[in-house]
Amino acid sequence: MKILIATGNRDKLQEIAQIFSDHEVMGYHEIMEPFEIIEDGESFQANAIIKAKAIHERLSAQDRARYLILSDDSGISVPLLHGEPGIYSARYAGEPLSSKRNLQKLIEEIQKRGAERTPAHYTAAMAMILEGRIYTVHGWMHGEAIIAPRGERGFGYDPMFIPQGENRTLGEMEESEKNAISHRAKALKLARKLLQSLTKTEG
């Protein structure tokens, strides 16, 4: 089964390829011109479905039968900030899009509330389209957001997030350690199990 991922983000592609190591994984831009997808859903799940459907609609009938389409939408939510940045995690600081600016804005917003660390959680929603049908799964990772980032690994908000039961930030962890506990890894593992059950049923 070939898996077509609705992203051009190399970090995401690498993480997905590790989980689906027994499948051929490729970004959608490898078979079509990249295009802008308007993510105007009101939840992570809605945005994941929007992305998957946008790719599906551009495939030929032959390619729709050849590929499983997999998309995700994910982000960090901080209860102290009434759930921000949430679905706006990737564009929290506005244009031009920048992970560093997003990170700094979240730090500043937490600081404004007089906190040095506060509960936070990541959500990952995955949407799969297989033979025209849409399936979704979710994964979560709970922990704390801190205002003093640590570590150079990972991406996004990783240097300021400490997973539950850990003393290190995601930015201080090896990729293999992060992938064992991350919200996206949990959702991907569920997606893999779902794919296995679907292909067995169809077989």
From Swiss-Prot:
Signal peptide: none annotated. The keyword Metal-binding applies. SUPFAM superfamilies: ITPase-like. GO terms for molecular function: dITP diphosphatase activity; ITP diphosphatase activity; metal ion binding; nucleotide binding; ribonucleoside triphosphate phosphatase activity; XTP diphosphatase activity. Pfam families: Ham1p_like. Disulfide bonds: none annotated. Mg(2+) binds at residue 73. One of its GO terms (biological process) is purine nucleoside triphosphate catabolic process. GO terms for cellular component: cytosol. Its cofactor is Mg(2+). It is an enzyme of class 3 (hydrolase). Its EC number is 3.6.1.66. Gene3D superfamilies: 3.90.950.10. Binds 1 Mg(2+) ion per subunit. It catalyses: XTP + H2O = XMP + diphosphate + H(+); dITP + H2O = dIMP + diphosphate + H(+); ITP + H2O = IMP + diphosphate + H(+). Keywords: Hydrolase, Magnesium, Metal-binding, Nucleotide metabolism, Nucleotide-binding. The active site is at residue 73. The keyword Ligase does not apply. It comes from the Bacteria. Substrate binds at residues 7-12, 74, 155-158, 178, 183-184. Homodimer. HAMAP family: Non_canon_purine_NTPase. Pyrophosphatase that catalyzes the hydrolysis of nucleoside triphosphates to their monophosphate derivatives, with a high preference for the non-canonical purine nucleotides XTP (xanthosine triphosphate), dITP (deoxyinosine triphosphate) and ITP. Seems to function as a house-cleaning enzyme that removes non-canonical purine nucleotides from the nucleotide pool, thus preventing their incorporation into DNA/RNA and avoiding chromosomal lesions. Belongs to the HAM1 NTPase family. This is dITP/XTP pyrophosphatase.
